[in-house]
């Protein structure tokens, strides 16, 4: 099982990724984790990545793809792998294809933006303990106060509505085009690569976590 998980920030990809990797016994491939591990290990690719990072520059797609290929050689990828958060752009997807990275499924978790804004902007947390609440789905007993200590709850900057909207705008511009890219490849094939076209699956990300999990498993049969 080799798959890519697509969906907007706040669509629930991380939660479903955990279920999928446990069910199929495959690792979740995170480019951030790969970069940190390669830098820490001092591999040639890691040292090259460190030069970019130390200079405050984005690591090139070519270097990321080389790291991906290196990571996929590890024994834990023998039965497959799950990409969550990569590729983010068409050039990255194209580079993966040209590098011969095989994908069986692309699974999109579809959630309307209005719902994502409600989900993310409603989060509240107690800074000292890490306890989390949601003004709509899991409210504290007393509005704005932690259940245990009675101390004020905070809203993280990442969860503020204007920040959420900006993240969704970036997704719309950079990552959403991947939906069309993979849909077209799945439907029409691509003679420029020997790779077999992946199957494209779209599921609704609305409902309970368990309902979405069952939809995901059904889509990957």
Curated annotation (Swiss-Prot):
Protein name: Adenylate kinase
Entry text on domains: Consists of three domains, a large central CORE domain and two small peripheral domains, NMPbind and LID, which undergo movements during catalysis. The LID domain closes over the site of phosphoryl transfer upon ATP binding. Assembling and dissambling the active center during each catalytic cycle provides an effective means to prevent ATP hydrolysis.
SUPFAM superfamilies in UniProt: P-loop containing nucleoside triphosphate hydrolases (SSF52540)
Molecular-function annotations in GO: adenylate kinase activity; ATP binding
Region (LID): 122-159
Entry's family note: Belongs to the adenylate kinase family.
First-tier enzyme category under EC: transferase
Sequence intervals crossing the membrane: none
Binding residue positions for AMP: 31, 36, 57-59, 85-88, 92, 156, 167
Source species of the chain: Paraburkholderia xenovorans (strain LB400)
UniProt xrefs under PROSITE patterns: ADENYLATE_KINASE
